Amino acid sequence: LSTGQVMDKIDAKGYYGVFNIKRLFVRKAQCHFGWDWAPDMPGYGICGDVKLIGCVKNRISDVHYRAYNSGKLSIFVDLNYTVREHMTEDKQIRQCDPECANDILRYVVATRPDSPISEGNGVVFETKVTGEKNFANFTIDNPELWWPNGYGKQPLYDYKVQLVRGGKVVDERVGRFAFREIALCQEPFDRTHMKYCLQVNGVNVFVKGSNWVPAECFIGGIKTEKYLRLIDEAARANFNMLRVWGGGLYEKDVFYDICDSKGIMVWQYLMFACSDIPEDDPEFVETCQKEVVFQVCRLRNHPSLVYWCGGNEKTGSYWHKITKGDYFVDVIMRGTVNNYDGTRPYARQSPCSLTDVGNDVTSGESHAGSYERSLIDGVLNYRNKVSDTGVMFVSECANMGPGTIEIYKRMFPEDKLWPMNEYWRDRLMENPYSEFKVPFCERQLLYADTLYGESDTLRQFV
């Protein structure tokens, strides 16, 4: 069945969500069902790489690590088999494969960053497999710490884990790790406000960045070169964080690899956005748990990932007192994330606060920005708006920019390119939920005219 055919059968009565209520039940990028910046085109099919990998039956299933600024490092290895024979009083309940009885795990860890493992740059440790779960500890002298963009360098160390059977390497995992520690500081600021501050290696970080939504509407077409260009532009603009938005998708490995090397911290959403969550549907909850376990295990080795978030603008953000999904994000998802990671802060949603209103500016982080409001009311009021808002951490603030001239030429007939007209209003997206009832094209023109002076031509506007 196509995505549309599946959705036709969904009964979403009693739930709240923006743009498309039935999307709640479909585990797919939510923005594919239409957003104020994305068309309603829910394609279906395989959108990532497909590989056929030959492997042995008994092998490594996962490797993850924990690194500490002291230089201590633990590498954890999960296998898809055991070498233990578990016994009860009257019977054996698990038989190990005899060929695996003498398996060995070989750990190789670089002692210097940003250089390959070699005879002069690596510590080797071998030990017998102890069961499905195994680990080994190391200490690296004078470790070089990983820092966000603008705060220092991003040294990355190589590691390798090999499964040795009968003197031969039958499976291997390689990766990179970094020494850095993350904390979220929430302490009293004054009598009525609580701080919300991210700390890296014990240092308060002034977070600067933006949302990251899928770089193409059809995500299968995103090339590595585009990830490199966009993330490099973010770094050169002095960003230090990208917020992988909950209405999009868990990004490809290459995205996180580039962020690791560029010092771009990643705020990683679980993929829920702007709606209730049907926590009363057991099948839905089970599916989501499997999804989150897979993604946490896939992403937890990236030093750039510093923050987990249970979803974007769940219904508590809309000043609703009764919402569906609180237990899901507060308990089920929090427990799942902490069980499989536990080294990073987890927030129930964004925005979040310590009161019963998610978008309360007195604590937590808020989407109550002052930028757009000040432009609507007059840019001379900007400083007053900033002061009046009094928010502790602004995690999202809607902003608009133009397309390219080439894009506009593909969108509009030659005689409709400029000035703005009914074609612009028809072919640019809109947000019916916005409190500012100004078409997006006219809002963009307002931004341009207010900040840079009146635009007489399309080129001036762009």
Stretches with model-predicted labels:
Residues 5-10, 15-24, 30, 40, ...:
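Active-site mouth of glycoside hydrolases
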Residues 34-38, 320-323, 456-462:
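Active-site rim elements
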Residues 35, 46-47, 210-212, 244-245, ...:
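Long, contiguous hydrophobic alpha-helical segments, chiefly transmembrane helices and signal peptides
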Residues 41-45, 308, 379-462:
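Substrate-binding clefts and catalytic carboxylate motifs of secreted carbohydrate-active enzymes
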